[in-house]
């Protein structure tokens, strides 16, 4: 179960804004719920921010001058990119622009195995090729040693980047990065491709007219893919880019849009994030990032289609590899359930593809709601890890705590990476536990609803009005609404039982909602039950007729008290870690015989159920999550059920003989703890 937070709009401000603009009340409720209570700021958000003068970014004028001089002299220029979607799109834009200027131009992107950023081997190779000027895109801000070598080899260097600068900047003719402390540009949140886009505008004399028409579509893809805030200038870039993307002249993008079965009349940032960007990223994860660049640059239809097919195949491999790693993790957790008792998960495996461990880490965070470090071990005993966390637990500081074991690490509060010797993984795991387990309060993944949706809010005009907030993305997510006390009238299986549709009543409103990836027989509800749901609203069009679509993001039976759930879950994990708790508490969570009988009877009746669903069905004042989990552990100890901790699935097992629950490992352990606590 995930934690919910339901925000409240400001009804006074909503009413005030409705008198000043033609936005719908539901849209204004969302905006005021997100803290936008000043009308000028509201107007700026929907009007879109004009792109500021590219020359406001520190060193932009110098960069343009150096590059223009190299173009005029026909010096060999190399664009040095990065292997992710942001780096690929940055490379594509700048290469295409300089080629159109008649430059003597090439590009270089390191393979993932070489690591992020500049490397000495590549620099030596570029010098041998006769490169006179290196222009980095989406990297370079930390390349202090590499920059010195470039100077020694009598090459010039222009750095364009958007990552946080170190204290010491590299030696370069120009360093174009909005995050420089001395950069006067007011907008700081550009992706690497946004910086490259502005460099092209600077090379064009400062005008955005040509570069917007030629590159806004590619720039939008890189911006969405890099998950930078879709506010301010980024919002403007993506909005314009989506307009151009529908009729793009880039052959590779046209094939990709068609093969991904995207509707050209309804292209949005979600389509980029889930259908286009992952395919481009797959080339850097499993093949060569050069394939993605060639896809975007190719002017030959046959070549472009072949490149797209290659990318799609690589993306299929990526998905398969993710699934294989997830299966290994599930098997490990089922064999070692104590893994889940810790506040931060550390999981490692030999041969796990390091190109996907970041994605796996994100999936683990979403599923278990816990910060985690996923580590891949190679044949030489070297290990590389990727981590994801939640706001409130700084994974970078955790890495600092473990720094003595790490060869290299970096990141920020919610994400990071590391490398170490495989022999140190066990020590690292213990140090992570020592750092995180004792924390008094620990954050959890939280789903945020913009408002409690009332029946009268649900109408076509209101739902259609939400489109004004697009494009959605980081810091401007698609609106999410809470619906509390929804009565289930009918349950309908979809796609051979893979998904579920419900017909429901919500006050005076009668509607349908879709719950993806939930088989009806695995639902926590039945006809007649009341549900609380978090939903996204949209518009379906069929035979030119519009209707409201409701997609359920999360749901639970009405009446569940989430604070009690999470407090009891935390206590259970403390117990399993062996932390000493008061004797009075331990007594309360040891189930009575009658409580054990009641839980067992329910399980034997339903046969298969998840622990969370069981909690929602039978929890009460005396049966909290901690006590319920202990009941399940007791039954598992005695072979009365099969319990798979990785998925929390409980399956009834027909007993072969009578068992004595009193001598179960779990009860023995609890009684020992009770004795130590001073019975």
Describe these PLM feature segments.
Residues 2, 7-133, 152-154, 204-427, ...:
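Hydrophobic helix-and-loop "lid/oligomerization" segment in the mid-to-C-terminal part
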Residues 85, 141, 164-165, 180, ...:
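Short, glycine/acidic-enriched loop or turn micro-motifs at the edges of active sites
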Residues 93, 170-224, 593-595, 599:
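Short alpha-helices
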Residues 94, 99, 235-332, 388-395, ...:
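Acidic, two-metal ion nucleic-acid-processing modules in DNA metabolism proteins
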Residues 108, 137, 160-162, 176-178, ...:
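Generic beta-sheet signal
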Residues 114-115, 143, 163-168, 182-184, ...:
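Short gly/pro/ser/thr-enriched loop/turn and capping motifs at secondary-structure boundaries
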Residues 143-144, 226:
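Intrinsically disordered, low-complexity regulatory tails of plant transcription factors
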Residues 164-177, 504-509:
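Acidic-glycine-rich active-site phosphate/pyrophosphate-binding loop
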């Amino acid at each position: 179960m995930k934690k919910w937070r339901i925000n409240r709009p400001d009804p006074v401000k909503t009413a005030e804004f409705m008198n000043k603009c033609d936005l719908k009340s539901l849209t204004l409720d969302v905006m005021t719920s997100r803290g936008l209570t000043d009308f000028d700021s509201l107007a700026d958000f929907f009007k879109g921010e004009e792109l500021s003068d590219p020359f406001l970014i520190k060193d932009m004028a110098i960069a343009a001058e150096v590059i223009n001089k190299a173009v005029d002299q026909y010096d060999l220029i190399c664009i040095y990119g990065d292997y992710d979607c942001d780096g690929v799109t940055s490379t594509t834009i700048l290469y295409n622009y300089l080629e159109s200027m008649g430059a003597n131009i090439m590009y270089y992107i390191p393979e993932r195995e070489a690591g992020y950023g500049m490397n000495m081997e590549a620099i030596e190779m570029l010098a041998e090729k006769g490169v006179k000027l290196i222009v980095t895109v989406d990297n370079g801000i930390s390349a202090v040693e590499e920059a010195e070598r470039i100077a020694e080899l009598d090459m010039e260097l222009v750095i364009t980047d958007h990552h946080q600068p170190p204290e010491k900047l590299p030696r370069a003719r120009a360093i174009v990065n909005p995050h420089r402390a001395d950069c006067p540009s007011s907008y700081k949140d550009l992706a690497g491709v946004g910086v490259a886009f502005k460099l092209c505008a600077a090379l064009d004399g400062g005008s955005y007219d040509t570069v917007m028409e030629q590159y806004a579509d590619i720039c939008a893809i890189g911006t969405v893919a890099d998950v930078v805030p879709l506010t301010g200038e980024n919002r403007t870039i993506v909005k314009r880019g989506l307009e151009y993307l529908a009729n793009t002249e880039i052959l590779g993008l046209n094939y990709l849009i068609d093969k991904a079965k995207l509707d050209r009349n309804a292209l949005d940032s979600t389509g980029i994030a889930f259908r286009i960007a992952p395919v481009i990223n797959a080339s850097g994860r499993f093949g060569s990032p050069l394939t993605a660049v060639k896809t975007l640059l190719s002017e030959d239809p046959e070549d472009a289609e072949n490149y797209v097919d290659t990318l799609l195949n690589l993306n299929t491999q990526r998905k398969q590899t993710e699934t294989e790693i997830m299966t290994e993790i599930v098997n490990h957790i089922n064999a070692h359930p104590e893994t889940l008792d810790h506040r931060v998960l550390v999981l490692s495996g030999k041969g796990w593809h390091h190109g996907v461990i970041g994605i796996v880490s994100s999936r683990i965070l979403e599923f278990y709601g816990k910060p985690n470090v996923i580590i891949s071990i190679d044949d030489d005993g070297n290990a590389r890890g990727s981590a994801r966390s939640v706001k409130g637990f700084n994974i970078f500081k955790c890495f600092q705590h473990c720094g003595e074991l790490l060869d290299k690490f970096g990141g920020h509060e919610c994400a990071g990476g590391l490398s170490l010797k495989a022999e140190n993984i066990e020590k690292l795991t213990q140090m992570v536990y020592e750092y995180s387990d004792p924390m008094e309060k620990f954050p959890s993944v939280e789903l945020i609803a913009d408002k409690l949706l009332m029946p009268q809010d649900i109408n076509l005009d209101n739902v259609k009005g939400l489109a004004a907030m697009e494009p959605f993305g980081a810091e401007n997510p698609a609106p999410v609404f809470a619906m509390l006390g929804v009565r289930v009238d009918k349950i309908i299986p979809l796609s051979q039982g893979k998904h579920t549709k419900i017909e429901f009543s919500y006050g005076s409103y009668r509607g349908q909602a879709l719950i993806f990836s939930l088989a009806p027989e695995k639902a926590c509800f039945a006809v007649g039950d009341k549900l609380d749901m978090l939903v996204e609203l949209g518009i379906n069009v069929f035979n030119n007729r519009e209707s409201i679509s409701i997609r359920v993001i999360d749901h639970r039976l009405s009446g569940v008290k989430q604070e009690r759930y999470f407090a009891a879950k935390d206590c259970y994990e403390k117990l399993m870690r062996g932390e000493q708790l008061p004797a009075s508490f331990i007594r309360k969570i040891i189930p009575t015989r009658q409580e054990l009988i009641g839980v067992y009877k329910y399980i034997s009746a339903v046969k298969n159920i998840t622990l969370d669903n069981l909690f929602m069905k039978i929890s009460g004042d005396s049966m909290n999550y901690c006590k319920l989990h202990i009941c399940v552990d007791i039954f598992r100890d005695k072979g009365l059920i099969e319990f798979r901790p990785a998925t929390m699935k409980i399956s009834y097992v027909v007993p072969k003989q009578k068992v004595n629950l009193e001598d179960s490992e779990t009860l023995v352990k609890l009684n020992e703890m009770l004795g130590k606590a001073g019975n």
